């Protein structure tokens, strides 16, 4: 990662080895804190696994009509975001590897343009992930507290419009990040967006779980009460809690890195923390790998559809193993 005073979004999201590509010196960094090098194979493996898993998730949602609900549409949006961030990191790693080993010769200016595209993809992904998680949280809130009117409030058409708005907003953010990549205010904007959405989601969760128990008791007295639906709604809320928890754990070091990059780039301790940037990229990719596992763990319908898709492509030994679960 580049720790130069030129605070570009590019510098914040490249691997440590990019300094050799651009021929820039790493300043303000303690000699005791060297950049952590991670094998290219690790990035490629995580990128490939994430790609396959999230394609499986999207395929399951498309294939199974029982998964054609607003919550799973938002899950599909989250899967696309996960796939995007993993693939952008993997592609960037391949590009850096090829240039470092002189397999391809590209002008520094063109390399920077390519990296701007990769960085934009990461920005689009994190904003899309946050927006999709927020949409799922709102969907679960409506399911629990407005159960009898849920299908009138959250229709498939409305969920489609919401997803379209999410990705239009995210792509617009990506374009802005490319245009103003030299400004540190772009980074401040991204950090502010992260904590603002995090605040809304956590507040919604606290409110949701504090009131859920009393609401369940009250609605249970209604003759139209559906206990199965209510349990499914709470299960969906717990699944979302797991997704949000993993998202915070995996993305927080990255955003802390951005904060330190702006606030204390010359501090030795900040420099030491920033020297592990490659590890923070790995954590982000791990988030993309873990999310589909959570879907499979929490949804029997999703597991069954995964099995059908895998078996449909002739992996009979894998199907035999899956059949045990």
From Swiss-Prot:
Annotated compartments: Cell membrane
Disulfide bond positions: none
UniProt entry tagged with the keyword Metal-binding: no
Lipid attachment locations (S-palmitoyl cysteine): 311-312
Transmembrane portions of the chain: 38-61, 74-97, 115-138, 156-179, 187-211, 240-265, 274-297
Keyword Endoplasmic reticulum on entry: no
Residues listed as glycosylation sites in the UniProt record: 2, 15, 28
Principal subcellular localisation of the protein: membrane
GO biological process: adenylate cyclase-activating G protein-coupled receptor signaling pathway; regulation of metabolic process
Residue intervals on the Extracellular side: 1-37, 98-114, 180-186, 266-273
Family to which this protein belongs: Belongs to the G-protein coupled receptor 1 family.
Protein name: Melanocortin receptor 5
Origin species: Rattus norvegicus (Rat)
Name of the gene this protein is made from: Mc5r
């Amino acid at each position: 990662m580049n720790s130069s005073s030129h605070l570009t979004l590019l510098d914040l999201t490249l691997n440590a080895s990019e300094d050799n590509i651009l021929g820039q010196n790493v300043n303000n960094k303690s000699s005791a804190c060297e950049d952590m090098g991670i094998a290219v194979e690790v990035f490629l493996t995580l990128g490939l696994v994430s790609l396959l898993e999230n394609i499986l998730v999207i395929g399951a949602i498309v294939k199974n009509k029982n998964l054609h609900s607003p919550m799973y549409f938002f899950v599909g949006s989250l899967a696309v975001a996960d796939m995007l961030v993993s693939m952008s990191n993997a592609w960037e790693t391949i590009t850096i590897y090829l240039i470092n080993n002189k397999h391809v010769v590209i002008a520094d200016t063109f390399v920077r343009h390519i990296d701007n595209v990769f960085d934009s993809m990461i920005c689009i992904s994190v904003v899309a992930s946050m927006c999709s998680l927020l949409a799922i949280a709102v969907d679960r809130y409506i399911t629990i507290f407005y159960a009898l009117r849920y299908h009138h409030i959250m229709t498939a058409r409305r969920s489609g419009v919401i997803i379209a708005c999410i990705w239009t907003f995210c792509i617009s953010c990506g374009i802005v990040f490319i245009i103003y990549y030299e400004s540190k205010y772009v980074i401040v904007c991204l950090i502010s967006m992260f904590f603002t959405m995090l605040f809304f989601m956590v507040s919604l969760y606290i409110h949701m779980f504090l009131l859920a128990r009393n609401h369940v008791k009250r609605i249970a007295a209604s003759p139209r009460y559906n206990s199965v639906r209510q349990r499914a709604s709470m299960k969906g809320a717990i699944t979302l809690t797991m997704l949000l928890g993993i998202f915070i754990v995996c993305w927080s070091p990255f955003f802390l890195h951005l904060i330190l990059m702006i606030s204390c780039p010359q501090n030795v301790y900040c420099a030491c923390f920033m020297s592990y940037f490659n590890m923070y990229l790995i954590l982000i990719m791990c988030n993309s790998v873990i999310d589909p596992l959570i879907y499979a763990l929490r949804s029997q319908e999703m597991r069954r559809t995964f099995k059908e898709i895998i078996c449909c492509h002739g992996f009979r030994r894998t199907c035999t193993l899956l059949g045990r679960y």
